[in-house]
């Protein structure tokens, strides 16, 4: 990554997805490996003054709860992901879990909630968007 950033003037790196990046260390657990990868990416972003976006899976238990809206605690295999990140954005599609209505009472059909679960320098919050499942596209909610 260092070489690519310096020779190609890259300002953004995307990792799809974090749990697939291997970091082998004797006697370490998978959680420790993912933690080390998250910390290494954070340090690399600072060192090279670039943005790194790392996609991560959620724990499978999210869909088995009464409230399937994801939280920071649902990040798979590491609490270090939350610690190392400046911003954590979670995507929640209630329709995927068989939920008919959003928290505000509007129809959950073709909707997605973007959850800003952590936002160093930007704060936290949520925004509801439209979601066109057939083409995997987010749109203004009003255009659905």
Task: Identify what each model region corresponds to.
Residues 22-29:
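Conserved ATPase-coupling elements of RecA-like P-loop NTPase cores
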Residues 11, 20-21:
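DNA transaction DNA-binding modules
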Residues 17:
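Walker B catalytic acidic pair
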Residues 34-38:
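…and closely analogous acidic/polar surface helices at protein-protein or active-site interfaces
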Residues 1-13, 27, 39-49, 60-144:
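C-terminal regions of RecA-like/P-loop NTPase motor modules
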Residues 21-22, 61:
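Catalytic P-loop NTPase motifs of RecA-like helicase/translocase cores
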